[in-house]
Amino acid sequence: MKLLLLLLCLGLTLVCGHAEEASSTRGNLDVAKLNGDWFSIVVASNKREKIEENGSMRVFMQHIDVLENSLGFKFRIKENGECRELYLVAYKTPEDGEYFVEYDGGNTFTILKTDYDRYVMFHLINFKNGETFQLMVLYGRTKDLSSDIKEKFAKLCEAHGITRDNIIDLTKTDRCLQARG
C-alpha cells in the first residue's frame, strides 16, 4: 500500500511539474497577458554582429500591444548615437504560437517561456537573402531581472545552439531608457 501511495505521489508530482512548464509555452499561452510595458534585458544570437552595438537586431523593447491575430511592438534602436522609436506589427501564422514580422528581412518567432508578470523569452529566426540566423531575447517587466531568470535564459539559448559568448546582457548598456518618457 505504501508503495502504491508513493507511486501515486510521484505521478502527481510529475504531472503537476509538466503542467506548470506547459502553462508558459505555445499551447497554453494566454497572449493577452503579454500586453503592457517591457524592458530589453538580454539578447542572444548565433550571428553576434546583429546584436552588437549598431547591430540591426539590438532593439530596446518598450511596449507590447496584443491586437487581433497580431502583436504590436514599440521599441527603440540606436542609430548614430541617437535613439529612434519604431513600431512593428507581427502577424499570427497558421502554426500554433508563431508570428511573422518584416524587419531586416523576414522573421518568424515564438514565445518560448513566460510567467507574464516578470519575464518573457522569444525565439526568432531571420531569413534574408538566402541566409538565416537565430535570435533570442529576454524581456522583463522591470529594468532588470534576477540572475536565476537570466541563467534559465542562457540555458535555453544553449539548448538552441547559441553559445554563452553570443549572449549580451543589455542591462549594462544604454537602452534608450531616457527616451521612454
UniProtKB/Swiss-Prot annotation:
Intrachain S-S bonds: 83-176
Main location class: secreted
Signal sequence residues: 1-19
GO BP, sorted A to Z: aerobic respiration; cellular response to lipid; energy reserve metabolic process; glucose homeostasis; heat generation; locomotor rhythm; mitochondrion organization; negative regulation of DNA-templated transcription
Description of what induces expression: Synthesis of this protein in the hepatic parenchymal cells is induced in vivo by androgens, glucocorticoids, growth hormone, and insulin, and inhibited by estrogens.
Glycosylation site residues: 54
GO CC annotation, single: nucleus
Keywords: Allergen, Behavior, Cytoplasm, Disulfide bond, Glycoprotein, Pheromone-binding, Secreted, Signal, Transport
Entries under InterPro entries matching the protein: Calycin, Lipocalin, Lipocalin_CS, Lipocln_cytosolic_FA-bd_dom, Maj_urinary
Localization (cell): Secreted
Presence of keyword Glycoprotein: yes
SUPFAM superfamilies assigned: Lipocalins
Tissues of expression: Abundant in the urine of adult male rats but absent from that of females.
The keyword Mitochondrion appears for this protein: no
GO molecular function, one term: small molecule binding
Function per UniProt: Major urinary proteins (Mups) bind and release pheromones. They may also protect pheromones from oxidation. In this context, they play a role in the regulation of social behaviors, such as aggression, mating, pup-suckling, territory establishment and dominance. Acts as a kairomone, detected by the prey vomeronasal organ and inducing fear reactions in mice.
Family designation: Belongs to the calycin superfamily. Lipocalin family.
Entry protein name: Major urinary protein
Organism listed in the record: Rattus norvegicus
